[in-house]
Amino acid sequence: MSDDAGDTLATGDKAEVTEMPNSDSLPEDAEVHCDSAAVSHEPTPADPRGEGHENAAVQGAGAAAIGPPVQPQDANALEPPLNGDVTEDTLAECIDSVSLEAEPRSEIPLQEQNYLAVDSPPSGGGWAGWGSWGKSLLSSASATVGHGLTAVKEKAGATLRIHGVNSGSSEGAQPNTENGVPEITDAATDQGPAESPPTSPSSASRGMLSAITNVVQNTGKSVLTGGLDALEFIGKKTMNVLAESDPGFKRTKTLMERTVSLSQMLREAKEKEKQRLAQQLTMERTAHYGMLFDEYQGLSHLEALEILSNESESKVQSFLASLDGEKLELLKNDLISIKDIFAAKELENEENQEEQGLEEKGEEFARMLTELLFELHVAATPDKLNKAMKRAHDWVEEDQTVVSVDVAKVSEEETKKEEKEEKSQDPQEDKKEEKKTKTIEEVYMSSIESLAEVTARCIEQLHKVAELILHGQEEEKPAQDQAKVLIKLTTAMCNEVASLSKKFTNSLTTVGSNKKAEVLNPMISSVLLEGCNSTTYIQDAFQLLLPVLQVSHIQTSCLKAQP
């Protein structure tokens, strides 16, 4: 009987549902909710027969249902949907179509409506489930990354053979990354219940996206901090292992820790170089032309002459800029004539250098030098230059006499050695060879030193002459005549230096006659080269006198122009 009554009631209820007017604004889900709400106000008798009927109805529809059966809830327990327009229309339709009076057929529709409510869950529940699932996935990923970083740390510590205290420090670094991940998961689980019950699709999607964004940010932070900690840990342990195994690394590390300024380093290097050079000079005096030329103050006088020449050149240019017309043309012609004298006499000096150099001697050079300075009308005495020339000629003559005596002794000893045994000859020959080598070194050293000294004194003399031409002339003399006298003076200096270099090479050849060419030829070539350099320095200093003579000519012309 109960089965037949249920079928009739179900068919009657379906008829009522079909007879109700269909409206576009009321969907099927809303009808189901309205029926359930209308029935929930009626008092339902709690008899065991009704519960059995419910279970039978649910089991009969198990093939078509997906979700588990949901028991009817009170109207107060249901939360209203967020979409206000839909709920108002739905309530209005419910009030118009369903009455709240108790009807005998209302129990069976309640079961069917509950079954329909289970069949179509609210759309917001799917988004909420997806949000919690995404958060749990990201949380598990961050936890996996954290555990991976700690595993990298442990493996690095094991490979670097860290034991004892170092292993304890690595264990202390692990909780930082391990504690950071559970915090993120707890935060994610705390956020889950608050955001899980959205009732509309838009709010659920927004909640899910915000939750995923927060989890991604926290996961990124944990990954970055964990990675940096792991790299720092590996780097420190690697440096410690290298320092323990390599003693040189400790030394370089201590040197790198020192902060030394560049000036201090340069000062220390300069002091060390000075000490090294001082030790070399005390032990053995080297035959370096540049160093010897600087010792005799030749370089300082050459630089001073260059400064004086540059100043004179600037004065000439400024004075020419202030003139115009005929005065400018006349002055230019005079200056060009002085320049032509310098250029013409330079070629004559090169042609007559060899012939005059062979004829002149030390005394003749000193006499000629004094006469030329007197013609310039300058109060300059070549005392230092004359002394240097005299010393050079004296030691050359002494060396030649010593060499001749040594050659005679060697010839006599050779005749005596022929009568003696071969055993007694070997040590004596070794001693004589040592004496000869010392003589060659002394001659070479004296040659280079004499050339450097004579050249330095010549440049010093030209510097003094330039100063006296500008400021200390006793009598006025035309610049063209002064230029001719200076050319003669410079030519005499160059010829004297050339003759000295040839005498030095001759003495070297005589002393090293029994030596091999590999030993003798470099010395002779060096002496000839330094002799050519000496003449070049003197000629360059002479060219620096041209602006000085031009300024002197301008000064004399200005004095004559004044009344």
UniProtKB/Swiss-Prot annotation:
GO terms for cellular component: cytosol; Golgi apparatus; nucleoplasm. It comes from the Eukaryota. It is found in: Cytoplasm. Residues 166-179 have a biased composition (Polar residues). GO terms for biological process: angiotensin-activated signaling pathway; connective tissue replacement; fibroblast activation; fibroblast migration; fibroblast proliferation; gene expression; heart valve morphogenesis; inflammatory response. Keywords: Coiled coil, Cytoplasm, Phosphoprotein. The keyword Phosphoprotein applies. Residues 343-367 form a coiled coil. May play a role in neuronal cell development. This is Protein NOXP20. It comes from Homo sapiens (Human). The lineage of its organism: Eukaryota, Metazoa, Chordata, Craniata, Vertebrata.
